[in-house]
Amino acid sequence: MPDFLDIALPLLRLPTAPFHEHRIVAAIDTLIDDWSSTHTPLSIERDTAGNLIIRYEGANSGDWLYLTGHLDHPGFGFVEHLTRQDLLFERLGGLPVQFCRDAHVQIHSTRDLHPPLSGRITAYLEDTLFEGERRPAFRVSVDESTTAVGHDSFAVWDLPETDTKKRKLRATACDDLAGVAVGLTVLANLLKEGARSRVALLLTRAEETGFGGMLDYAASDQLDQEGVFINIECSSCLAGAPLGDGPVIRVGDRRWLFDPQVTAALVKAATDPSLAQLPYQRRLMDGGTCEATVLSRAGVRTAAVALPLANYHNTGRRGVRREAINLDDAEHLVELLTRVARTGATNLLHSGDSGQDEWLQ
């Protein structure tokens, strides 16, 4: 079965943006199809919002453990033609607008109706009126006719190719495609081992524009009230979690503290004396809000982990830059989540009970 890099590199080379995750979804469909056979306990489904739920059912009973991540990254959504060579794009998610002037973008089509077009941002329009609302937008100029660009088109930063160097993985959209790759690698490990557990990977859409996919899932009948959830994110290292010091076991975010029992179980799995000790960082990570808060507020047991991230949302010191994670952090996070996934949700909660007792002694 493939390892983390085998899965991450192809995904991270694909464009994505809120509401424009189709290339990532197609790649995951192909991957799961390659792994599946008539005897493989693996299935994939979509909910009404377009979220993916990949299930590994290695046991016939027991509560489900859900790993979650999101399929999008901040980008630009096409609005209208201004002239034959000038286009208006709306802002989709958090973008480093202070560096946008003259920055280059690649324009894609949701249905792949045209090859990527190169464009340049010529203006940031902070208060643009369209569809009855005032929203931030960008004017993008291209060197050729824009007749191929339509309402299914979107744009992403035009940055150097994804690569690895000195144990760092650099890509336009580590957040959260690296987290998605971690979850997929955990499923690959379970398949390889034939683990007797029930684990699902929930991959949501439009997280960067206000948790659209997760809010829809949390409000739907598909929300598993008996399940245990662990959110996988990439979170800025500026919150006090350096790259290379291990993945973060996240006790909370800006708005919420997560389930202490599940958090304790994660710590116990990392420090299990019968296995190799895994480096980890236990942090609040209050620089922003993540999908674990949505799930917690919906009433389900939720914890969170994160990969420390450099150049969060492509914000470098002097311009738009690729994001970066540490490969050791990613591989240790895969191992940590594989350990808890092997045990399943019920055993995870029992482990968390004893882990909390140890903290109080």
Locate each region found by the language model.
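N-terminal hydrophobic/helix-forming segments and targeting peptides
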Residues: M1-Q361
